[in-house]
Amino acid sequence: SLSQSQELRLLMKMVLDDLQSLQYLENFVKEKDSASETGLIAKMVLGPESSEVSQVDFHAAVPSRFFRDIESVREGMDPGLHEIGYRLELDTARDVWQFKRREDFYIDGDLLEGGREQILSESVVKFIVSFRIETETAAGFLEESFEDYVWDTDERTCFENKSNRCLPDAIQLSMSLQGASGEIVS
């Protein structure tokens, strides 16, 4: 339906806007004994109908969406750098899958937790984020692949060793919604 297509378009725009602002905070993890995480952490988790879906957490240089109630944000002093996360979680009390966006106003040592969660939709049945990596073949050609669905920035080695990338070369997003009638929109 038109409303489902519109909802899907808006959800994908929000996720892609955040992912396009993905940041690797080199100075945040500079200390050798630092346990802080930065960059991108993405994994596959169990989703609707026992399918696998993505769960992503990252730092992004975007204005705050969820902290408009903080006076400094209302006065235009948003730091513009936040922890962001997207996931599908089952509300067991209602047996409904909820697509959520997490935003932590301040960056801290734990990239996976904290901040506020907002339910964006209860219609999402597919959320897949894949990453493109360019690799050089033995013949010296560049080969591209979007087959990686898991990413965990190795904070302290990605600048020293070029085979350990801080961030992917490109990101691909695939989402689907299911309407009340069972129709799936992709």
Regions found by a protein language model. Give the residues of each.
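Short linear sequence signals and composition-biased patches located at protein termini or domain-edge surfaces
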Residues: 118-186
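Extracytoplasmic beta-strand-rich oligomerization domains located immediately C-terminal to a leader/signal peptide
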Residues: 1-113
